[in-house]
Amino acid sequence: MRRSLTAALLLSMMCSTAFAAAEGGDDAGAQMRRAQEALERQRVIDQINEDEQSRRAEVEQEAPTEQSDQSSVTFTLKRVEFSPTEILSTEELQTIVDEYLERDISLNDINAMIEKINALYVDKGYMTCRAYLPPQRIHEGVVQIGLLEGRTGNVNVINNKHTLDSYIKNSFPLSRGALDNTVRVNEHLQWFNGVNDVQLRMAMKAGSEFGTTDYDIYAFEPRNQRLSIMADNNGYESSGRWREYVFYNNRSLTNQRDAFRLYWQHSKGTEAWGTGYTLPLGHRGIKLDFDYSNNNTENIKGQMKSFGVESDSYSAGVTLRVPFKVDRTSRYEAGFQYQHQESKTDFGTKTDLRLRWVDDNYNRYIPYVSFTHYGGHSILYHKHSARFIRRRDLTGATGDSVNYELNGFWQRQWSGGQSLSSSFEAQLSSRQGLGSSDRFFIGGNNSVRGYEESFLGGEEGFTANLEYTLPLDRSRRLRALTFVDYGRVYGSTVIDGENDLVSTGVGLNAYLKNCSMSLTLGVPLKRHFGGEHLDKTRVHFSINGNI
């Protein structure tokens, strides 16, 4: 009798508030999705920072020596003879010479002619080649001009502690003894710096052998290993607001810029961890990401605490990233991700009757394209994804859906350190009744501040925010901010009139040598939901330290 009563009570609660918990934003699958989004957001920020460092990279060459005035001696130019060339045509040289033939000229005029020939070399992209005036006795108006077409000599890689020489050298069209085009080398340098975390500077110098040019490639590698410890209060009320994290990142595990990463997350009701590995494919920035994550969540607050609610989820995926345009003003990337996920939720885990409520199996196929545009003082980023989802639920029924996802970010900076930024996220879906890990949630520090994490959810929705940041000290390590956030969700489970959030607030960010802190006071401007009144303010806090 007691077992039957427990089952009846449990079933009743499952059909009311428990159902909302199972399909809400605080179960293991949904939390894991939010964690993956946060990691992707950080990856994009890191990429933008790396792009900023690489935008002005170019091959450096020794400065030419200045010519002294040599206009005192003149003669009539009859003919110019050139040494053999593999780059310049007879017609191109003759066009330059014709301007001076049958004229009284000085050595200054000959030097001007040589400068025009050298400019022609530069226009063709051969900065290692030059024309010069060899020692000679000018007889009957005939001038000899030498054409020194420098060939590639030694290519030296310097300061590459965690990057193989071959990884760098094979990225450039430099062959010993060849006439290499410097413009092409510059293009490859820009591309390399745009698709790698290690940044290069290249300098040309006279080769150790006559007629050759040596290249010194200096590598500026970021810190190879980093251990970060983080804490915040941006967790879920049902599983613990305070969360602790440990992140480990090795940027070049086997010295070929293959990155390994590992993270662990803990709160009072959550244990989560994940790992990943990135393998470069070739030398054009194509990368293959392998990722695995796991999340176990227990309900520690609310009506279901005494009965017990536990959810488990894991996800394994592979992503191919292909940059197809990288230059000083833009970075375009296309990619494809496959992801497999399984999520389970049990009710009554603290009773003698344990019931499986959710048992979902997902296969997702996600093509995407992203664009980053760099202005003089601004950045615009937008990513477009199509998420093709196949879901099998507890009953064995399958359902297919397609989600369109948009992620955008814009920032404008001024010389005084002030910045104005805006972000936008949106999702459209082809069907209702999505699983929690594919729904769109709003609320939280990375969404609409002033509200609990994933406070509202639906099949479709969007968020937008506007933020102004102002430095408070000369070093710009202390910054104040103010913001306005807005979000709205749509779908079959959304209650009309209670489907949007809006907030404003202020914050303070501090950046120290190995530590950063963020304190934000969010003020929800809409506070009445389901007959309950939210607090007038909500504090979001995080601290991050690097070892």
Question: Where are these predicted regions, by residue range?
Answer:
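Extracellular loop and loop/strand-boundary signature of outer-membrane beta-barrel proteins
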Residues: 177, 233-234, 261-262, 301-307, ...
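Periplasmic polypeptide-binding modules associated with outer-membrane biogenesis and secretion
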Residues: 22-233, 264-272, 424-426
